[in-house]
């Protein structure tokens, strides 16, 4: 099956510089049906990366500054921000290098460029894997805090959290090396897809279980205070909306990229599959959008973190 170069497309982030041509353009040839290819302008791509870079840098700086935020939960959030930060940095760096090379402003030997590209490729792949892992870790941490509240501090200790974080980083680096080495194997692509599906199922099961438990708890309190059903229903709708945002953002931002990999592995020669695969840069831009949204969902909802963020911003002025 001709999958050579497919994983390089994943870890290579932008194998060619996004053009500033019209955002929607039909891609046609004599053998393929008309396709709708979405072009991401290079300026927009770089802006998204820079916004994510600034946002996640602030999260890491705030958590590092405030000792009250050095709990296991915030350690996982900090590592998620660091992973998203690396995703943004590596993609912005690769795009900038490609632009400089095309403009002739950067002169380097082919071997040096190749080695630099390999390093950036591995950084992109490892940061994506670690980002998915820490999203799962945050879901598990919240699950334990709800269902094992009395034993939470004995189960999720800072030492265990640090060991788990170290294991995630080591596993991410090793997996990126393996994926990059065996990029021409269909199995490598399918492993990535299975890993994404496993994280999606894990998060869905944990958050749905947490929502049902919270709804039951709210109903119990309502009965105790003899409240009416609209209050219970309103709380349930709020919880369902939160769950929809958590899983919806995860699926919408990460799903297209892994659909891209699945189609490359399953139907690389099919015209319809080829039409979808051509939108790789759009899928990559969605990953960077996820890196922008993650701090809003997981970090900035904390009152303590927002308070420290204000102090950091005021001090910087």
Curated annotation (Swiss-Prot):
Gene Ontology CC: plasma membrane
Positions of transmembrane segments: 38-63, 73-93, 119-140, 164-183, 192-211, 241-266, 280-300
SMART domains for this protein: 7TM_GPCR_Srsx
Leader sequence residues: none
One Pfam family linked to the record: 7tm_1
Entry's Gene Ontology BP terms: adenylate cyclase-activating G protein-coupled receptor signaling pathway
InterPro entries: GPCR_Rhodpsn (IPR000276), GPCR_Rhodpsn_7TM (IPR017452), Melcrt_ACTH_rcpt (IPR001671), MSH_rcpt (IPR000761)
Extracellular-side segments: 1-37, 94-118, 184-191, 267-279
Keyword flag Cell membrane: yes
Cytoplasmic side: 64-72, 141-163, 212-240, 301-317
Topological category with respect to the lipid bilayer: Multi-pass membrane protein
Keyword Cell cycle: no
Record localization: Cell membrane
Primary localization: membrane
Residues listed as glycosylation sites in the UniProt record: 29
Keywords linked to the UniProt accession: Cell membrane, G-protein coupled receptor, Glycoprotein, Membrane, Receptor, Transducer, Transmembrane, Transmembrane helix
Gene3D superfamilies: Rhodopsin 7-helix transmembrane proteins
GO molecular function: melanocyte-stimulating hormone receptor activity
Function: Receptor for MSH (alpha, beta and gamma) and ACTH. The activity of this receptor is mediated by G proteins which activate adenylate cyclase. Mediates melanogenesis, the production of eumelanin (black/brown) and phaeomelanin (red/yellow), via regulation of cAMP signaling in melanocytes.
Subunit structure: Interacts with MGRN1, but does not undergo MGRN1-mediated ubiquitination; this interaction competes with GNAS-binding and thus inhibits agonist-induced cAMP production. Interacts with OPN3; the interaction results in a decrease in MC1R-mediated cAMP signaling and ultimately a decrease in melanin production in melanocytes.
Family in the record: Belongs to the G-protein coupled receptor 1 family.
Protein name, entry field: Melanocyte-stimulating hormone receptor
Species this chain originates from: Varecia variegata variegata (Black and white ruffed lemur)
């Amino acid at each position: 099956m001709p999958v050579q170069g497919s994983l390089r497309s994943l870890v290579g982030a932008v194998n060619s510089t996004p053009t500033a041509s019209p955002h929607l353009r039909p891609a046609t040839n004599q053998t393929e049906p008309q396709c709708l290819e979405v072009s991401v302008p290079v300026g927009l791509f770089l802006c998204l990366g820079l916004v994510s870079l600034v946002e996640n840098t602030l999260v890491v700086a705030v958590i590092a500054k405030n000792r009250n935020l050095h709990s296991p939960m915030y350690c996982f959030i900090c590592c998620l921000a660091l992973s998203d930060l690396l995703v943004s940095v590596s993609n912005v760096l690769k795009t900038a290098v490609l632009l400089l090379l095309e403009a002739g402003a950067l002169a380097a030997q082919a071997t040096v460029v190749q080695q630099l590209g390999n390093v950036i490729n591995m950084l992109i792949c490892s940061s994506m894997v670690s980002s998915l892992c820490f999203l799962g870790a945050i879901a598990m941490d919240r699950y334990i805090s709800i269902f094992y509240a009395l034993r939470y501090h004995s189960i999720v200790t800072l030492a265990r959290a640090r060991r788990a974080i170290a294991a995630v980083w080591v596993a991410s680096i090793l997996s990126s090396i393996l994926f990059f080495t065996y990029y021409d194997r269909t199995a490598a692509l399918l492993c990535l897809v299975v890993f994404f599906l496993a994280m999606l199922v894990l998060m869905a099961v944990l958050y749905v279980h947490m929502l049902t438990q919270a709804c039951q708890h709210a109903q119990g309190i309502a009965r105790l205070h003899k409240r009416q059903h609209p209050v219970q229903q309103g709380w349930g709708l709020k919880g369902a909306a939160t769950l929809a945002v958590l899983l919806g953002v995860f699926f919408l931002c990460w799903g297209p990229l892994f659909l891209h990999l699945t189609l490359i592995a399953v139907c690389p020669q099919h015209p319809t599959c080829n039409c979808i695969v051509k939108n790789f840069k759009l899928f990559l831009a969605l990953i960077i959008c996820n890196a922008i949204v993650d701090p809003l969902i997981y970090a900035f909802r904390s009152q303590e973190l927002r308070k420290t963020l204000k102090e950091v911003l005021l001090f910087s002025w």
